[in-house]
Amino acid sequence: MATDAFHVHEEKGDPGRIAIVLPGQAYTAQGPLLSYATHALLDAGWTVRVLIWDVAQPRGAREVYADTLRDSVREHPEARHLVVAKSLGTLALPVASELGMPGAWLTPLLEGPAAPPLRTAIRELVTSGVPTLLAGGTGDSLWSTEHAQASGARVLDIAGADHSLEVPGQWRASLHALGQVTTAVADLASEQATTRRP
């Protein structure tokens, strides 16, 4: 399948801890969820690699996301890896499961045609004991509180939040949700930084 152009921007930190940020289609890494998560990771000393699409509507996203994870592990096999993905970026879930990679999956596609393999991958990650965070909002048609909670993953279920994890017409609730997500990502990263590798 043809893929569109992209590049990976890297902010160097500890070479033994690498976080990979996978944006959505219309939600770039400059969006608040990924931007603040990136700041939290950098503040904690992680090397952060951010995938940036060079087109508005990327083709072949699934393959690009998968290759980005595999390439990072191949290039840095001794490093701890963590993925933070938003929406379309959660198409990388099956490869994360294959690699045993911990992750924070923001607004994962738990409903719709893309959902079945992603739900399976989440269950595989949880069954394997790989730390997995799912964050979504009850106002998002692509999110399923039921499937998220049944998976056994850590779940941040935000009442009334849409696919951007914002609560329409309620800026205070939206800011609170942003803080919850950023804290959850920071906590997950902190755990991975101190967990003994197998």
Regions found by a protein language model. Give the residues of each.
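Short beta-strand/loop motif that positions the catalytic acidic residue
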Residues: 127-129, 133-136, 140, 157-158
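Active-site nucleophile loop of the alpha/beta-hydrolase fold
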Residues: 24-25, 53-56, 104-113, 137-139
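Catalytic histidine neighborhood in serine/cysteine hydrolases
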Residues: 45-49, 152-167
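Gly/Ala-rich beta-loop-alpha elbow adjacent to hydrolase catalytic centers
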Residues: 82-94
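Flexible "cap/lid" loop of the alpha/beta hydrolase fold
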Residues: 59-63, 105-129
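Catalytic histidine-centered segment of alpha/beta-hydrolase-like enzymes
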Residues: 59, 161-176
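Conserved alpha/beta-hydrolase "acid-adjacent" motif
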Residues: 30, 114-115, 136-147, 166
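Serine-hydrolase catalytic machinery in alpha/beta-hydrolase-like enzymes
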Residues: 1-79, 167
